[in-house]
């Protein structure tokens, strides 16, 4: 019926890909067993402790759902004793203990009522809100106490709509002074003793009916932002900034444009990365933050966004690694190379913390831009991303530089045109040493946005960037995946399709395919026969139970399995490609996305090649004359697995192709070119490495090159020399697989997919 194990009709996917590789779980490096301070009597009831920073710092650890009271951190003093156990309101405590995490109770609720009323609320407790007659509820009517000591949902507000500005509400745990909401009226928020206010202490009713600043919250020392909360808030805020840049060029930021943002190469957005390398941060956190910034840059670039970058690391003194004026500051690869070269040890000899000097370097970069581009500087949007613990012990208050930056950029000076959209300062605080008050003072404060975040450890920062840079706005980009540790096989191979054919005499037979557009799946022609009825063909996608119906099968016109039977060649797989047109248009989601096709605008963007790149130049980039790392996706035990292979396209190509003559049915073929035409790519064998081989149900699946965090299909799995999956322990060295080279069938693909908005070159 087929050559080797074919046809394979059996069952066989600012601001980041897999981020922060190598970032461990410990906030700071653990010290040895010795400490200058005695460990006698430092135990915590219900928990444990560990030493950090060569025994100079002691961190208390508690089980999930509990927090260290009265403090998480103690420092070893020069007197040889540990810092006193005292609460944030300076109450002395004799012994540390792990207390249950609770959520703050409402201090007040205007124009309505809530229940149940309690002195405190435990994890998973719920609270409900109701408004009096004449008032309408905004926000969440029901809220649940979460594991980080915060309530889910949004602040519940009862408003009658009769005031110039809407009632700004009283976030749970805060107190508000001021109940008049006329133009220029102000409200002030307070926290109870021992809690830190994050957000805006004072808010003013502005023209247009909005409030200045951002909604406040009262934070206890044990409270952290979850990765999901940070990702959603940061992405939402940063996306608005980027879309604003797009709108400056006269484009409406529609859904499609949100997915394909291309910034003005002259620099309509500048991103400044500021990384704290001081002694209080520690080598582990510094390296982890550096890795996250590296992958942030990589991921942003994979979306086709090209801002200009500035990079500053600092301790006692700042080091400017990249200036936005550098010729290559918008080239992600070069920026990443510069970032990779920095080390925590660069600041070892002067390990103080001078945040003000670091921000002055950012100010100086902005000032040069203002002076150099006098005509256009006021259309440039600036994003500052600061990674720090918020501690500073020299140089003065860094907030003064923030004020200078705002003045330089003419932000907040004109009430009718405050230009707040042109500056966003995000501060990420990581680990147990974070000073919440200081990081809040540095960050931007905007209505309905969050710019300051405190995370529990580096692994949480990793989660933030994974979630933050892979949201619904990018679903239309080809070759994108969600590589997060919690992702399913179809999150990681979202293009993968399973095609099932029901034949009355043979039952069910299956192939693989790849989503290439909203209507089409690319697969192998030999997966079908001329007698197959459309209603007997079903397509499964995204690991879902739903089956998509087929409208038609489009074969390559030169495909003919029986073309060389007269020459004694039973099956001939040249031009073994087909397109499956679906009846229903696909709605892209995280488990259903297209793969990139060669010589399209999508693959040019994915590879970050110049727009002037030709199809031939792209082919030389992806398929040079050498062994090429590639992969295919195989199904085993109902799960998808990537298999790494090498395309033999150099000096091993001829020997790879010659092994085709060892396939059953080809024994009498003298000239390998009779069965292996220029349309084929060859993988398999044991040189330079033992490649895995495809199995029966893998036919029609994509042969893929993974480059620059994107996945580009270069081939379609067609046939193999040996069915190795019948005897996986006895794989001969001549086991080879052959794939249709998509570059060789591009005219046909371009013709059939011309209405799919793929932008063929």
Curated annotation (Swiss-Prot):
Cleaved by CFD following activation of the alternative complement system, generating Ba and Bb chains. Cleavage and activation takes place when CFB is already associated with complement C3b. Mg(2+) binds at residues 278, 280, 353. GO terms for biological process: complement activation; complement activation, alternative pathway; proteolysis; response to bacterium. The record marks 259-260 as: Cleavage. PROSITE patterns: SUSHI (PS50923), TRYPSIN_DOM (PS50240), TRYPSIN_HIS (PS00134), TRYPSIN_SER (PS00135), VWFA (PS50234). Glycans are attached at residues 122, 142, 285, 378. The active site is at 526 (charge relay system), 576 (charge relay system), 699 (charge relay system). It is found in: Secreted. CDD domains: CCP (cd00033), Tryp_SPc (cd00190), vWA_complement_factors (cd01470). InterPro entries: Compl_C2_B (IPR011360), Peptidase_S1_PA (IPR009003), Peptidase_S1A (IPR001314), Sushi/SCR/CCP_sf (IPR035976), Sushi_SCR_CCP_dom (IPR000436), Trypsin_dom (IPR001254), TRYPSIN_HIS (IPR018114), TRYPSIN_SER (IPR033116). Residues 477-754 form the Peptidase S1 domain. Gene3D superfamilies: 2.40.10.120, Complement Module, domain 1, von Willebrand factor, type A domain. Disulfide bonds join 37-76, 62-98, 103-145, 131-158, 165-205, 191-218, 478-596, 511-527, 599-615, 656-682, 695-725. Its EC number is 3.4.21.47. Residues 1-25 form the signal peptide. Transmembrane segments: none annotated. Monomer. Interacts with complement C3b; this interaction is dependent on the presence of Mg(2+). Precursor of the catalytic component of the C3 and C5 convertase complexes of the alternative pathway of the complement system, a cascade of proteins that leads to phagocytosis and breakdown of pathogens and signaling that strengthens the adaptive immune system. The alternative complement pathway acts as an amplification loop that enhances other complement pathways (classical, lectin and GZMK) by promoting formation of additional C3 and C5 convertases. CFB is cleaved and activated by CFD to generate Ba and Bb chains; Bb chain constituting the catalytic component of the C3 and C5 convertases. The unliganded VWA domain has an inactive 'locked' conformation whereby the scissile Arg-259|Lys-260 bond is protected from proteolytic activation. PANTHER family: COMPLEMENT FACTOR B, SUSHI DOMAIN-CONTAINING PROTEIN. This is Complement factor B. The lineage of its organism: Eukaryota, Metazoa, Chordata, Craniata, Vertebrata. The gene is CFB.
